[in-house]
């Protein structure tokens, strides 16, 4: 029985790429800087001491980081026995965003340039805003700027509740984000507005990767909270991913846990499972792994590393999240059968010690575990698509256009 379990630790980069200068990210190192802060006692809020990831270390994480950066992460064991195969991978795609990273993991790099709303104030074209107001019958809008999602709620959340005007904002990513209160504005109404925005952005030729619904609750600045009802409306990948090939060519199954289905615009997904928070994502993943039959991929995105700690530049929170992940990792490993493979990876970086609030251009770890996987280094991979090609070879689908199988 052949099954592949892919776990994306969203934003867990392991050191700047060779082209990081193009992105202003020279020196970025999500893992290394978290480990450094922990070793210095600067991340003791809710946790304590050096970064403690024994299970990820056994799968080759410290070695992969060393390959990427040339040094062993502070306070971590560079001499631990390694029981998995490990690599560090460079992104071929032109961006450092979620769809680009995930699509490339599945064998389809993004070789075109996304559209962006680069102006920090008055970010969106007036023509687009006017169409949204008219089509959705809105009383107006708030925001129209670059912002962190939590900051803008404190700034505009109360006014939104009073006026019913949705909050429009963006970032350095190719996104159009809409924040609305679940109760005063309504979740269904927010989703409908996002559908309209997706249509207008596509028809207008803006080439924007995602429209993101950002629902929140609370009654005043300081206690607004984003909920787990986020919804991403992505464009479809430009070519069939390995997920699609498994379904089409092998009559296989692809189970999305978390936001995976949204990222691939539901292409190549046969089952969707929603879950919010690290523990809930783990629980859902374990359930699906136990139930998975032959020719199945279970694909989980652990978004909290990015959304809760990376973008918010919360080093201690990120470290605590990694340690929780590591503590629960053996639960996944013990479900890996004789012919199965478990792949742990990331989609980009988001160094919580870096300036600003945006992603960072970094190598990603590629950690592969299974009874038939030979432990040791798989070296520097020139594209994330090597993961997709490896999975294609494993399941016996037609080759992907990009990437080289790692084994």
UniProtKB/Swiss-Prot annotation:
CC terms in the record's Gene Ontology section: cytosol
Protein's name according to its UniProt entry: Phosphopentomutase
Catalytic activity: 2-deoxy-alpha-D-ribose 1-phosphate = 2-deoxy-D-ribose 5-phosphate; alpha-D-ribose 1-phosphate = D-ribose 5-phosphate
Record keyword Isomerase present: yes
Necessary cofactors: Mn(2+)
Cofactor note: Binds 2 manganese ions.
E.C. numbers: 5.4.2.7
GO biological process: 2-deoxyribose 1-phosphate catabolic process; 5-phosphoribose 1-diphosphate biosynthetic process; metabolic compound salvage; nucleotide metabolic process
Main location: cytoplasm
InterPro entries per record: Alkaline_phosphatase_core_sf (IPR017850), DeoB (IPR010045), Metalloenzyme (IPR006124), Phosphopentomutase_DeoB_cap_sf (IPR024052)
Gene that produces this protein: deoB
HAMAP family registered for this protein in UniProt: Phosphopentomut
Statement: the UniProt record of this protein carries the keyword Oxidoreductase: no
Family: Belongs to the phosphopentomutase family.
UniProt pathway: Carbohydrate degradation; 2-deoxy-D-ribose 1-phosphate degradation; D-glyceraldehyde 3-phosphate and acetaldehyde from 2-deoxy-alpha-D-ribose 1-phosphate: step 1/2
Superkingdom field: Bacteria
Keyword annotations: Cytoplasm, Isomerase, Manganese, Metal-binding
Coiled coil: none
Biological role: Isomerase that catalyzes the conversion of deoxy-ribose 1-phosphate (dRib-1-P) and ribose 1-phosphate (Rib-1-P) to deoxy-ribose 5-phosphate (dRib-5-P) and ribose 5-phosphate (Rib-5-P), respectively.
GO molecular function: magnesium ion binding; manganese ion binding; phosphopentomutase activity
Subcellular location: Cytoplasm
Residues that bind Mn(2+) 1: 10, 347-348
